[in-house]
A protein has these predicted regions:
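The short loop immediately C-terminal to the conserved phospho-acceptor aspartate in CheY-like receiver
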Residues: 56, 60-61, 85
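Non-catalytic signal-transmission and effector/linker regions of two-component phosphorelay proteins
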Residues: 1-10, 130-131
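Acidic catalytic/metal-coordinating carboxylates
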Residues: 39-43, 65-69
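C-terminal output helix
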Residues: 91-93, 111-121
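Two-component/phosphorelay signaling modules centered on CheY-like receiver
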Residues: 18-36
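Short amphipathic alpha-helix used as the core "switch/output" element in two-component signaling
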Residues: 46, 68-80, 97-100
């Protein structure tokens, strides 16, 4: 298990495919990330209202609410949320919508864990910088 910034990064994986959720969870936890899963966009929104996550990785094509709609709703809740989308071949228009809507990156299925880990390393660095900036701002706002 890694003990870098990974161990502080919390990730929500959203996919209606149980195998994808399980493989991502196991792979990312092995690298030291804290991982939760949701099997639908609706479950993801409920989870995000109860818990804090640095990153959401979501499938684009899901049941009643797709990943594009989920991304837009999450961005309304938290504009700084780092969202990554997963797609199967042939969903390029949806990927473009997600990137225009604020997704940080996209991963094509079949997934390559190495690509995801590279993006999450960048996400961890961003989260650390934002946390540091927020802490400094909070201290200066309180006169310390």
């Amino acid at each position: 298990m890694k003990t870098t910034a990974n161990s502080k990064l919390s990730i929500l994986v959203v996919d209606d495919d149980e195998i994808i959720r399980m493989v991502l969870r196991q792979s990312l936890e092995k690298e030291g990330y804290h991982v939760s899963t949701a099997n639908s966009a609706e479950e993801a929104l409920n989870t995000l209202q109860r818990s804090f996550f640095h990153v959401v990785i979501t499938d684009i094509m899901m049941g009643e609410m797709n990943g594009v709609e989920l991304l837009l709703q999450i961005k309304e809740m938290n504009s700084l949320m780092q969202i990554y989308v997963m797609t199967s071949h042939g969903t390029l228009p949806h990927v473009i919508q997600c990137m225009q809507g604020g997704a940080y990156d996209f991963f094509e299925k079949p997934l390559k864990i190495e690509d995801i880990l590279i993006s999450l390393g960048e996400a961890a660095r961003r989260a650390t910088r934002w946390s540091s900036l927020y802490s400094r701002h909070s201290l200066s706002a309180n006169g310390k």
